[in-house]
Regions:
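Conserved PLP-anchoring active-site segment centered on the Schiff-base-forming lysine
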Residues: 14-36
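A short helix->loop->beta-strand "cap" motif at the edges of active sites that frequently abuts
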Residues: 20, 41, 94-98, 125-126
Length: 194
């Protein structure tokens, strides 16, 4: 768990290779797409359409390194069930992919059967990073305050083949490139209750 400026820190993806293949839902929150285009990564679109309730599911014919999921989705509002998230976790584990799970709108989920976190799925800690923003939860829009959960169990190989916890890489990135959320915003975030 790491306090951050919100989702933008991960979208810059300084802990992933520019050679990665990215799986992105369509329609999509523009930042997912644009930051990867700026890095020169290969983009593969997942077709969200009325027939699949705007919830694309894994396609075993596509090998991705990073998968973007947002639930509730921006811009459609569609939500994944636990069973659907289990299918995505199975896909990620099979393909050694990392799921970037955007939970910015999780506070709007009021059905206890709908997961508010990908970590309700067994083994998600081995393949997922969860991002959340207080912008939606507490009306903190524009304050750049959120958090990122990078489990210690999430291990991937570096370009040289060395196994590394992404948590350690993320912490190194944060301590090098992030000076912290301003104190007054931290105090406001502390006042948020669920």
């Amino acid at each position: 768990f790491c306090l951050s400026r919100g989702l933008g820190d991960v979208y810059k993806r300084q802990i992933f290779s520019n050679a990665n293949t990215i799986l992105i839902p369509d329609p999509v929150y523009p930042v997912y797409l644009d930051t990867n285009i700026m890095c020169g990564r290969k983009i593969v679109y997942m077709d969200g359409k009325p027939e699949n309730n705007f919830l694309p599911m894994p396609d075993d014919s596509v090998k991705a390194d990073i998968v973007y999921l947002c639930s509730p989705n921006n811009p459609t509002g569609a939500v994944y069930t636990k069973e659907q998230l289990e299918a995505w976790v199975a896909y990620a584990l099979k393909n050694d992919a990392v799921i970037l799970y955007d939970a910015a709108y999780e506070a709007f989920v009021d059905d206890p059967a709908i997961p508010r976190s990908i970590f309700v799925v067994e083994d998600a800690k081995k393949c997922a990073i969860e991002l959340c923003s207080l912008s939606k939860t507490a009306g903190f829009t524009g304050t750049r305050c959120g958090y990122t959960v990078v489990p210690h169990a999430l291990v991937r190989k570096t370009e040289s083949g060395k196994a590394m916890e992404l948590n350690k890489m993320w912490l190194r990135r944060q301590t090098t490139k992030f000076n912290g959320v301003p104190y007054i915003i931290q105090r406001g975030a502390e006042a948020v209750s669920y």
